[in-house]
A protein has these predicted regions:
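Accessory "access/gating" subregions that flank catalytic or transport cores
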Residues: 1-66, 118, 125, 136-137, ...
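Alpha-helical support elements that line or immediately flank enzyme active sites
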Residues: 9-16, 21, 25-27, 77, ...
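Short, well-structured alpha-helical segments that form the helix of a local strand-helix-strand
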Residues: 21-24, 89-103, 277-287
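Active-site rim segments in enzyme catalytic domains, especially the processed small/beta chain
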Residues: 33-35, 175-245, 273, 277
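Glycine-rich phosphate/pyrophosphate-binding beta-alpha loops
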Residues: 60-69, 167, 179-190, 238, ...
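Short Gly/Pro-enriched turn/cap motifs at secondary-structure boundaries
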Residues: 66, 155-159, 224-232, 319-323
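Internal maturation/activation junctions in enzymes
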Residues: 82-182, 194-195, 202, 210-211, ...
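Extended C-terminal subregions enriched in glycine
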Residues: 230, 272-322
C-alpha cells in the first residue's frame, strides 16, 4: 500500500502526509531524532557519474557520496599497468596484486572521500592514470606491504547485507544499473507501524570517529564525519561498461565494503580472463580493504598451494565471516544477444522478455 500511495501521490506521498506521520511516530517510539521538518527538507540530488577507461573499455559508475565508482576506476587504473592475463586467474601472483591494489585504494577512500557538498575530494587525482601508476610503483611481487605502512596519496601533487541491485536493459539498448540499500539486515531493526517498511541504519556509513571501524570494518576521517544535512559515504557501485560506445556489461552488487571488489573482479573476469557472464559472476571471490590487514576469502576461492605462497609473501588469509562475498547481478550484450547472470550466492534471478 505504501508503494501504491507513492505512485499515486509522488514525492509528497512519502515526505508529507500519512507516511511521514507514521515515520515520525515510529521515531518517537524508538527515541529517534527525525522530525516532520527533516522529512520535508530532504531532497534527492543528481550527481554526474564517475568516468574511466580500462584496456579500451569505457566505464560509467556511481559518484559521491558513494565511493564505489571512484575507487573502482582507481583500482582498474593501477591494474592496467600489469600483465593480468599472464598472471592467471586467482593465481598467487594475481591475488597478491589485487590485494596490494585494493589496500592502497581503500586507504585513499578512508582519507579523501565524503559528501562533495561538504568536502573537496581530490577526484581528479584518484581517477588519474598517472596517479595510479605512481600509487602502485612501490609494489613488490614478492612481499606484502603491511597496511600500517600504506598511507593515503597526497592530493597536493595532483589536483550490506540489506542492499539490492538490479541491472536492466531494453530492446533498444537503454541500460540501467541501480543499487538501493538500508545498510544492515533489516536496517536499524525498526518497522514503521502501518507503513510496512524498515528504517535504515545508514548513519553507520559515517565515520563516527577517525580510525574507528564501522560494521563493515571500514575506517574514515574528517571527509566522512557526521554533519547536519550531509550524506554518508557508501560503497555502492552500479556500473555500466561500454564497448565501442555501447553498453557491454551492466552490473552491480550488494555486499557493503565488498561491493567495489565484487564489481572489480567481475569486470576483470570478463575483460581480462574471457569468462562468460555467468561464469564471471559465479567465480569465487576474495576481498581486501586496507584495514583489517587481511585477505578475506570465500570457501574454495584459494587453493592450498596458492594460499601457502601468499602466506610466504606475508599475507594473512581469513575465511570471510559472512561466507559469501557480494551477490552480483549482471547483463552482458554482444553480437549474439543479451545474456543475464544471477548470482547463486543469494536470492537472485535473471529474466528476459
Amino acid at each position: 500500500n505504501t508503494l501504491k500511495h507513492i505512485t499515486r501521490v509522488g514525492r509528497d506521498g512519502f515526505y508529507t502526509g500519512k507516511i511521514a506521520d507514521l515515520i515520525v511516530a515510529e521515531m518517537q517510539r524508538g527515541i529517534g531524532l527525525i522530525t516532520h521538518e527533516d522529512l520535508l527538507n530532504y531532497e534527492s540530488k543528481y550527481r554526474e557519474p564517475v568516468k574511466g577507461t580500462f584496456n579500451g573499455f569505457n566505464l560509467l559508475s556511481m559518484g559521491l557520496p558513494s565511493s564505489g565508482g571512484t575507487i573502482l576506476v582507481e583500482m582498474l587504473n593501477m591494474l592496467e599497468n600489469f600483465p593480468l592475463q599472464k598472471l592467471g586467474w586467482n593465481s598467487s601472483d594475481y591475488i597478491h596484486l589485487l590485494t596490494e591494489v585494493e589496500r592502497r585504494a581503500y586507504a585513499d577512500r578512508a582519507e579523501h572521500l565524503g559528501d562533495s557538498d561538504y568536502w573537496q575530494p581530490p577526484l581528479f587525482m584518484l581517477t588519474n592514470k598517472k596517479y595510479a601508476k605512481d600509487r602502485i610503483k612501490d609494489f613488490s611481487p614478492d612481499h606484502a606491504t603491511p597496511s600500517i605502512n600504506v598511507f593515503a596519496g597526497d592530493p597536493t601533487i595532483y589536483e550490506s547485507r540489506e542492499t539490492t541491485h538490479f541491472s536492466v536493459v531494453d530492446k533498444d539498448g537503454n541500460a540501467v544499473s541501480g543499487t538501493t540499500t538500508i545498510n544492515l539486515s533489516y536496517g536499524g531493526g525498526f518497522l514503521v507501524e502501518g507503513g510496512g517498511f524498515f528504517l535504515n541504519n545508514e548513519m553507520d556509513d559515517f565515520s563516527s570517529k577517525p580510525g574507528i571501524p564501522n560494521a563493515f570494518g571500514l575506517v574514515g576521517n574528517d571527509a566522512n564525519a557526521i554533519e547536519p544535512g550531509k550524506r554518508p559515504l557508501s560503497s555502492m557501485t552500479p556500473t555500466i561498461v561500454l564497448k565501442d560506445k555501447k553498453p557491454f556489461i551492466i552490473l552491480g552488487s550488494p555486499g557493503g565494503s565488498t561491493i567495489i571488489t565484487t564489481v572489480l573482479q567481475t569486470i576483470l573476469n570478463v575483460t581480462v580472463h574471457n569468462m562468460g557472464i555467468q561464469e564471471a559472476v559465479s567465480a569465487p571471490r576474495i576481498h581486501s580493504q586496507w584495514l583489517p590487514d587481511v585477505i578475506m576469502a570465500e570457501p574454495y576461492s584459494i587453493i592450498k598451494d596458492v594460499e601457502e605462497s601468499l602466506k610466504f609473501k606475508g599475507h594473512k588469509i581469513e575465511s570471510y565471516y559472512w561466507t559469501k562475498i557480494g551477490e552480483m547481478n549482471a547483463i552482458l550484450i554482444n553480437e549474439k544477444g543479451y545474456f543475464g547472470a544471477a548470482d547463486t550466492r543469494g536470492e537472485n534471478t535473471a529474466a528476459g522478455y
